[in-house]
Swiss-Prot record:
Belongs to the insulin family. GO terms for molecular function: G protein-coupled receptor binding; hormone activity. Keywords: Cleavage on pair of basic residues, Disulfide bond, Hormone, Secreted, Signal. Residues 1-25 form the signal peptide. Residues 55-118 form a propeptide. GO terms for cellular component: extracellular region. This is Relaxin-3. Disulfide bonds join 35-129, 47-142, 128-133. It comes from the Eukaryota. Heterodimer of a B chain and an A chain linked by two disulfide bonds. The gene is RLN3. The lineage of its organism: Eukaryota, Metazoa, Chordata, Craniata, Vertebrata. May play a role in neuropeptide signaling processes. Ligand for LGR7, RXFP3 and RXFP4. The keyword Disulfide bond applies.
Length: 142
């Protein structure tokens, strides 16, 4: 009889949710679960999306002060460019696309050569989606 009461008490305890929230509470301090676009947005936010905007504004302000008379030289440079493109020297320097790409490795490259960083990203994104990850783990991708 005591066995049945113990089993009934255990069943009521599980059904009321006393067992499951405790397991979730232990996993919560690890990090936030991020999947798909949410993971990408978190990486961009963590790696300094606002710094890109700030550096763009600062670069624009610096260029405005550095090149005050660029418009005056623009017409003469455009004329020189037209002359150079019309000359036979320009045509001698150009190559066909086949000759240009012949000496370079193909876009495919050696199999697995550049996949290391992608594998790290894929591993972290899948673990962030399954178990969650902290901000310090996301910042390791920067």
């Amino acid at each position: 009889m005591a066995r049945y009461k113990l089993l009934l008490l255990l069943a009521v305890w599980v059904l009321t949710g006393e067992l499951w929230p405790g397991a979730e509470a232990r996993a919560a301090p690890y990090g936030v679960r991020l999947c798909g676009r949410e993971f990408i947005r978190a990486v961009i936010f963590t790696c300094g999306g606002s710094r890109w905007r700030r550096s763009d504004i600062l670069a624009h302000e610096a260029m405005g002060d550095t090149f005050p008379d660029a418009d005056a030289d623009g017409d003469s440079l455009a004329g020189e460019l037209d002359e150079a493109m019309g000359s036979s020297e320009w045509l001698a320097l150009t190559k066909s696309p086949q000759a240009f790409y012949r000496g370079r490795p193909s876009w495919q490259g050696t199999p697995g050569a550049l996949r290391g960083s992608r594998d790290v990203l894929a591993g972290l994104s899948s673990s962030c989606c399954k178990w969650g990850c902290s901000k310090s783990e996301i910042s390791s991708l920067c």
